[in-house]
Regions:
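A short core secondary-structure module
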Residues: 142, 148-189
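Glycine-rich phosphate/pyrophosphate-binding beta-alpha loops
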Residues: 72, 123, 150-155, 356-363
């Protein structure tokens, strides 16, 4: 798979299919099956699978242009492909050879979509408060789960769930690979979460009450018991670049809306863009976008190279890009004034979507605390 060809195909898909339809999808809170099928057919869900497991073996940096362009259409689409990318990173970096052979070729072929689940009602960024448990089956078959999970990305129709749980035999959480064939059955209740923005993409809540999953196992096998938090945070380096690309796509659209207002909206004898204050706002949007873009590109390269700085850079890129996205939408909305408050207006949707990037893959304030911690402890 040529990354440039992928980007070109995504650009055409966004222009021809997404932009003409996104207002209706957002209003109806739907991601049509055909659209998700198209994302799979484009190769976006299996792009990170290595060649020796049947995938194209692309890196995160290869996907930045495609993720960004997809987000110019709708960030929900970029979010829809993200959990399977996280699962791929988990399997490639931490899976046993048997787990890799079981799942990666099917992800590459578009036969399997995954979910990623850390958050619980009482535990978001504080992984030490995880309460979901997984005990060994009575005859040593699989795991028995109890507990609750929230904000399970892709958690309604995925084929496999990677979730953080306290597993019998370890004093720290482990990453459980949970086939989803039992979802909705005995001991596994499902509820879909209605959202203000970031609509269409699945966000689920789970309740486990003694759910026996014969095929469930610990990622990396028993040797990796207690390593789940480290494994899943490692994969989130990939996810934070994905979220940062969502933010870049929002910034791109906010800038386009601002330019349209400046050149199309008549003010007195001229247009809005004739006024210095409007030009200053557009110029600042261009400057801040360039800074966010450079940081995202640098972070993606660091994640691919497994640099020591990858965690810090991917976190910083996500924080800076998402804060810039919310800021840029606000600035564009000020230029558009009442137009941006009308139902169905693109800026009205962006106002609802942009804050998701400040929350997804870690709330920004929690991430800033994590960035500060090693520097303060080393002082």
């Amino acid at each position: 798979m040529d990354p440039r060809a992928l980007h070109s195909a995504v650009r055409a898909f966004v222009d021809e299919t997404v932009l003409p339809s996104v207002a209706g999808w957002d209003e109806r809170d739907e991601l049509p099956d055909g659209v998700l099928d198209r994302l799979v057919a484009l190769g976006l869900t299996g792009a990170l699978v290595p060649a020796d497991h049947g995938g194209p073996g692309l890196g995160v940096a290869d996907l930045v242009p495609a993720w960004r362009t997809l987000s110019q259409g709708w960030i929900s689409l970029t979010g829809a492909v993200n959990p399977t990318g996280l699962a791929t990173a988990l399997l490639v970096r931490h899976g046993t050879p048997e787990q890799q052979a079981r799942w990666l070729p099917r992800i590459a072929a578009g036969e399997v979509l995954a979910s990623f689940s850390i958050t619980e009602p009482q535990a978001g960024s504080d992984l030490g408060r995880i309460e979901t448990t997984a005990a060994r089956g009575s005859r040593g078959e699989g795991l028995v789960l109890d507990g609750r999970k929230r904000w399970v990305a892709g958690g309604v129709s995925s084929d496999v769930v990677f979730l953080l749980a306290e597993v019998e035999g370890a004093d720290r959480p482990s990453c459980v690979v949970l086939p989803a064939d039992g979802r909705g059955g005995p001991g596994w209740a499902l509820e879909e979460i209605d959202k203000l923005g970031y609509r269409g993409v699945e966000s689920a809540a789970y309740r486990f009450d003694g759910h026996h999953a014969p095929g469930a196992e610990v990622l990396g096998g028993d040797a990796a018991l207690g390593a789940g938090a480290r494994q899943m945070l490692d994969a989130l380096d990939v996810g934070r670049v994905n979220v940062a690309c969502r933010a870049l796509g929002i910034i791109d659209r906010a800038l386009a809306c601002a330019v349209h207002e400046c050149t199309d909206r008549e003010i007195g004898a001229g247009v809005l863009g004739d006024h210095t204050h409007a030009r200053l706002r557009v110029g600042e949007m261009v400057a801040r976008r360039a800074a966010a873009d450079a940081l995202v590109v640098r972070a993606a390269a660091a994640v691919d190279a497994r640099e020591d700085a990858a965690r810090e850079l991917s976190t910083a890129a996500k924080v800076i890009a998402s804060d810039t996205a919310v800021w840029a939408v606000d600035r564009a909305a000020r230029l558009a004034a009442s137009r941006s408050f009308a139902a169905g207006d693109e800026l009205a949707r962006l106002r609802r979507d942009a804050p998701q990037t400040q929350i997804g893959e870690g709330a920004n304030d929690a991430l800033l605390l994590s960035l500060a911690k090693p520097h303060l402890e080393a002082a």
